[in-house]
Regions:
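An N-cap/entry alpha-helix motif that binds or orients negatively charged groups
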Residues: 1-72, 178-237
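Conserved, mostly hydrophobic/aromatic
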Residues: 24, 81, 102, 160, ...
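Glycine-rich active-site/cofactor-binding loop and its immediate structural neighborhood
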Residues: 76-114
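Hydrophobic faces of well-ordered beta-strands that scaffold small-molecule active sites
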Residues: 79-82, 109-111, 130-134, 158, ...
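Glycine-enriched alpha-helix->loop->beta-strand junction motifs that scaffold or abut catalytic
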Residues: 106-108, 125-130, 154-156, 248-251, ...
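Glycine-rich beta-to-alpha transition loops that act as phosphate-gripper elements at the mouths
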Residues: 113-116, 137, 236, 254-261
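Glycine-rich phosphate-binding active-site loops on the catalytic face of alpha/beta enzymes
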Residues: 163-164, 274-288
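Conserved small/polar residues in nucleotide/adenosyl-binding loops
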Residues: 296-298
């Protein structure tokens, strides 16, 4: 990050405050909200704040490195960009911008099945840093084709999301009138108008669409694609399903959204190479344990 930006935004909290004033209210509520009363979301934050370190000192000459090797590939840091659906609502062209940033910084970038750009565009932009997140399709042929497209587009790792058997209730999003497709009316226009940079970029790029899925829909519109997502993705994941996915994908396979040690162990036994210990950012089950506390046991 350029020095002037580091001076203006030295912390993540500074970036969050800036983002909140740069994008419309409904986009912020989509990005920032959890499910229900947001207790799981808050537990995540509170538990992370309680994690502390006991440093070892007097270790001689300093030669620190944040590099880590994972699945035979070296990354610049042990962090990555997690999958986020509907990225284009937060900022037009966000999927490609994130992929390019990941390529520049040599960290993983995970494209969501319900991202707003096609894998054929985002994969090359990630330059080998791309992973593809799969919401499990019910249809075998759809599943096989999405996996094929991810491989053909240069994604190295497949991430199967396990913790979305059905859509969750996100009350802040309902209050903010977050809809797919958006219902364009006076309130939405007023909120967009006071965020001119976002509005201008959206006018240039068009409203966000689930572009990866439009290939399977005749005369695709956002309404049709949203209906397709509800009818075809999720609700079917089982250990047998995961085993079938393992047979379709030659590269590293990750299962995302596990909190139970027994599930994590079984995922590895079923053929997964790794798991992501996650409660979906507190966006699925409000009564779930904080992710970092499950990591201790897994």
């Amino acid at each position: 990050m350029p020095t002037d930006l580091m001076d203006r935004y030295p912390s993540v909290d500074d970036l969050r405050r800036r983002a909140r004033w740069r994008i419309p209210h409904f986009a912020w509520e989509y990005l920032d909200s959890g499910t229900g009363a947001e207790q799981a979301r808050d537990r995540n934050i509170d538990a992370l704040r309680e994690i502390t370190f006991v440093p070892r000192l007097l270790q001689g000459e300093l030669n620190p490195s944040t590099e880590v090797e994972l699945f035979g590939q070296t990354y610049a840091a042990p962090i990555g960009i997690a999958p986020v659906g509907l990225v284009g609502l937060t900022w037009p062209g966000g999927d490609v911008a994130l992929a390019k940033a990941a390529a520049e910084k040599r960290i993983p970038y995970v494209l969501s099945t319900v991202g707003t750009e096609k894998p054929e565009v985002t994969g090359p932009a990630a330059q080998g840093m791309g992973w593809f997140q799969l919401y499990p399709p019910r249809d075998h042929d759809l599943r096989a084709d999405l996996i094929r497209r991810a491989a053909d587009s240069g994604f190295t790792t497949l991430v199967v999301t396990a913790d979305v058997p059905t859509a969750s209730r996100r009350e802040r999003q309902r209050k903010a009138k977050v809809r797919v497709p958006p219902k364009i009316g006076p309130a939405l226009i007023a909120r967009a108008a006071v965020r001119p940079a976002w509005s201008i970029e959206t006018l240039r790029a068009g409203l966000p669409r689930f572009k990866a899925l439009e290939a399977y829909i005749d005369q695709a519109t956002m309404a049709k694609t949203a209906g397709f997502v509800g009818a075809n993705l999720g609700g079917t994941l089982s250990w047998e399903y995961l085993e079938a996915v393992r047979g379709m994908w030659d590269g590293p396979l990750v299962v995302k959204g596990l909190l139970n040690p027994d599930d994590a162990e079984r995922a590895i036994d079923t053929g997964a190479d790794a798991v992501v210990v996650s409660n979906h950012g507190g966006r699925q089950l409000d009564g779930s344990v904080a992710s970092i506390l499950s990591l201790i046991h897994i």
